[in-house]
Amino acid sequence: MFRSRSWFGGPWGGRPKNRLSLEHLKYLYSILEKNTTVSESNRGLLVESLRCIAEILIWGDQHDSLVFDFFLEKNMLSYFLHIMRQKSGGSSFVCVQLLQTLNILFENIRNETSLYYLLSNNHVNSIMVHKFDFSDEDVMGYYILFLKTLSLKLNTHTIHFFYNEHTNDFPLYTEAIKFFNHPESMVRIAVRTISLNVYKVQNPSMLRFIRDKTAAPYFSNLVWFIGKHILELDTCVRTDIDHQSNQKLSNLVAEHLDHLHYLSDILLLEIKDLNAVLTEHLLHKLFVPLYIFSLTPAPPPPSLAVVTQNLAAVLNRNVDIDIQEMHNPRVSSIVALFLLSLVFLVVSHAPLVHALAWVILNGDHSVFKEGAAEILNSYVEHREVVVPGFGEPDESLEQALDTVTGQSSSSSYALSEDSGVESSSPATTELDSQADAVEAEQIKLRNITDEEKQLLQKSSSSTKADFAEMAKPFLDTVLHALDCTENDYLALLSLCLIYAMSHNRGIKNEWFEQVLAKSTRGAFSYKTALIEHLLNIITQSSQPSSRIRLITVEIALELLVTFTRPSSDDSRCITAAQQDLLFSARNQSMVVIRNFYKSEDIFLDLFEDEYNEMRKAQLNVEFLCMDSTILLPPTGTPLTGINFTRRLPCGEVEKARRAIRVYFLLRRTCQKFLNEKESLLPLTNVVNLVQVENVLDLNNSDLIACTVVAKDSSKQRRFLVIDALQLILVEPDAKLLGWGVAKFVGFLQDVEVQGDKDDSRCLHITVHRGGVTHNRTPLLSAKFLFDDHIRCMAAKQRLTKGRSKARQKKMYQIAQLIEIPGQMDSPVYAVGGTMVASSSGGSGNSSGSSSRSSHHRPMFSTANRVPGFAAVLRGSNSAGVSRTQMAPNRSIEGIRNESAGRSRRRSPSSTSGSNLRADHSDRERSPSVSMGSHSSSQSRENSQPRSTGNRSRESSPRMPRPRSEEIPLEDFQHSRNNSPHSRGNPSPASRSHTPIRVLHYDQLSGHSGSPREASLGGTNALLSQLNGLNREVLPTQSSEETSFIGSDGNEATGGSEGRRRGAIETV
């Protein structure tokens, strides 16, 4: 009734209260003594006892040495072994706990003496060789984990506990490698870890045992296992044409990469004898008979080969046709190129990669009989000759290891004998199987006619001549794969192989280029042929309908730079004709971009985004070859999840992206050939931008006070400043009067402004992230509250116009980059219907003046400035930015004020001709008004077809101004150059993106009370200079216009003495 519920209840009650103590271990030992036989009734008790013993031993390792003394004194490991060997019910359940206990014990022991105690009585080796029931997944998992934990404890001192030199017994290694081909991937990974931990121990006798007893059978079985895996991979590629088995193919590629990295790790340990054996097996049992053999053309049907062989016997001619080769396993050329690329990308062991590269670059069909002995002899001394052949070993690894353990120490598993048997016995069997077929075909040959004999003789001789001419058949196959007439399916993998060979550390670059440069066919050079193939790919990629992926173009350009790189004394190894082809491809790519320049609304965002992506993404061919999708035919749908650069474009937007990226890649390559540095990209000069927390001089700048209400209803008082390219929210500096700290900065081109229906003082402003990005979260999305609706409207107007101007400026920069006709010399790029011709007759028009006129009106002038526009601070000799437009309904007073202000701010560094400047200065000094009246009348007559009647600004519709009427600006010089934090090192002047012929002006003045010139003749001369023709302006009926720079209504007299700063005037 009151029986204890614990595992230790019953007759063995009275356990110690302290769970981690020597007394508790003695108590657990008494339980093991009384439960030597495992049954269903006591297996739970035994499991709990084993778990507690492990805890006490780990505690005693760090706190009480008497615990281990008692454990060894009672030889408690023998009880563990006794429990394992029982076949009674529940033993498998207890074995799992035993293996887990041992694993925890060896994993957590830190004291070397305690470890030596545990390993000294050889019970651990007995546990390793015990025949567990590996059909139980738990037993298998804990057993391999136990072996892995022990391998981590291996070093030069502990190796003697595991390897017995007298008996040539090494159970930790031999038992582990038996599971190298286990179906569970975690088990295979653990086996590789165990073997590498064993190889790392530099013990000569142990390494000699591995080389003599286990290396050949292990590596031969491992190579065969990898080969079978490759055949499965090839089957998956052949059947998965529609990208339906992507996950399976990805797993197969990942598994093969694990194999390659494992082999590379073994070779990097630089164990000379072990590497020699592994290199022989890899080269002659896998790479040459399977990879290289798959690069050869598909053989004829066996029946035709037998007929040809028999005909040769009748005609007494020698035709070299190997019947066995026709039945050798092979993979598709796609898979062969992919696998060879992986070898050169992962493995860098010089004897192996050099021999394999020599076979590809210099080898012919004789390599399938002789192997790569010529190259390997220079690396390996006393090397046995091995005939290449891909086949299953005669013995499984488990059988071979059992045989080795039963043999005496003098026996040796000879590599040459093993290799000879593996390669010769399949051949003998194959020849015997073909003997009857040969005899049957000989009977048929007696009945063929003379004409048939002649045809067969010609075919056999031509085949022989073709093989003789193809001195380097494998290299020719690689180069022929670069043909991109249909698509770049084969070309991409061929480029990956060439790139991997040219960048492998085990292959000397000088030798690689020497082999390509020489040839036996006269003046023909494989290097020249390779460069021509690369240029063909580049030329085809710049066509509008090209089916070449971006990654192919990038690798081709990288290889072109690599193979034309100048040596120390010579110039680039490229002819003028080849260089012209490259530049022609760049020009063609610009032609393709021009088709998208006006057709895509988001062209500017695409352009900037592709440039940023190209700068961030560095070419990594090894990472590319980890992607299994390059093994499948190129697809154009994004539904497969394939990266954009590794598939064909889908839709007009992606076609535009591809065209832009191709142009960027070609432009960068051409600049490398010309030794030029990029000076026009990126479109935005980051150096001259305002950054967050910059301290800005806000004196003489227009600010609009506002309250920013965020999504979480938090409110912040800020001042809105609008620059040429940026929207800036500033907070006044607490220490310096008239200075502010930038708290938020965003590009005007990414601003979206919406008014509030309920509140005329409110604007909803969203600043999006620049470019086409997956992160759709905006940089700022908030409600802006202004003091009154006038300031709200002013802010909206400035933001809208600023966004338009910023985007137009960058679009003009792009037009300069891609050399759109009509955009190279003038910033005015025509839009249909916006340019009209002026009358040829009329006084005041000189013969050299332009025949085209357009209407302009001032955008960023100070004559009728609205609060919110960030006036450029006056600096020493720093160029400002001004855009000028003239509208036919502007008042004469506004024109007078504007012209007077601009005449004072005219820059002496203007690029206009000297004659034009002299003419302008003469007209400014002339007080005549009659000429202005006549010119204005002429201008008004010319503009009659465009405007009918006089309408006020409020009543006229707000039509968007055409692009052709705009003059792009220079970048503003930021006022942070005058900051006290940066006075010591002023930043350089902002880079100008405007063309040469654009007029330059000094910075706009922030003061509204400066004296004004009232000369109408000077106004007309300035406006006619800006418009490129001599025109005269007459006063027209003006519309009402509100100005924030204050004058009372005495403006009509032309005097400025009646002006009062701060008042609002209506003109």
Curated annotation (Swiss-Prot):
Residues 409-418, 927-947 have a biased composition (Low complexity). Disruption phenotype: Pupal lethal. Larval neuromuscular junctions (NMJ) display an increase in synaptic bouton number and synaptic area. In Garland cells endosome trafficking is impaired. Early and late endosomes are unable to progress into mature degradative endosomes and lysosomes resulting in enlarged endosomal compartments. In larvae, starvation-induced autophagosomes are significantly decreased in size. However, autophagosomes are able to form and can mature via fusion with endosomes and lysosomes. The keyword DNA-binding does not apply. GO terms for biological process: autophagy; endosomal transport; endosome to lysosome transport; regulation of autophagosome maturation; vacuolar transport. Its main location: membrane. Residues 409-434, 837-861, 876-993, 1037-1067 are annotated as: Disordered. Residues 421-432, 876-888, 975-993 have a biased composition (Polar residues). It comes from the Eukaryota. Residues 50-199 form the FPL domain. The keyword Transmembrane helix applies. The chain crosses the membrane at residues 333-353. It is a single-pass membrane protein. Pfam families: CLEC16A_C (PF19439), FPL (PF09758). Residues 917-926, 951-974, 1057-1067 have a biased composition (Basic and acidic residues). One of its GO terms (cellular component) is membrane. One of its GO terms (molecular function) is small GTPase binding. Keywords: Autophagy, Cytoplasmic vesicle, Endosome, Golgi apparatus, Membrane, Transmembrane, Transmembrane helix. It is found in: Cytoplasmic vesicle, Autophagosome membrane; Late endosome membrane; Golgi apparatus membrane. Belongs to the CLEC16A/gop-1 family. Interacts with the class C Vps-HOPS complex components; Car, Dor and Vps16a. Required for mitophagy, autophagy and endosome maturation, possibly by acting in multiple membrane trafficking pathways. Required for endosome trafficking and maturation. Functions with the class C Vps-HOPS complex member Vps16a to promote endosomal maturation into degradative late endosomes and lysosomes. In response to starvation, functions at an early stage of autophagy to promote autophagosome growth and efficient autophagy. Essential for the recruitment of lva-positive Golgi elements to autophagosomes. This is Protein CLEC16A homolog. It comes from Drosophila melanogaster.
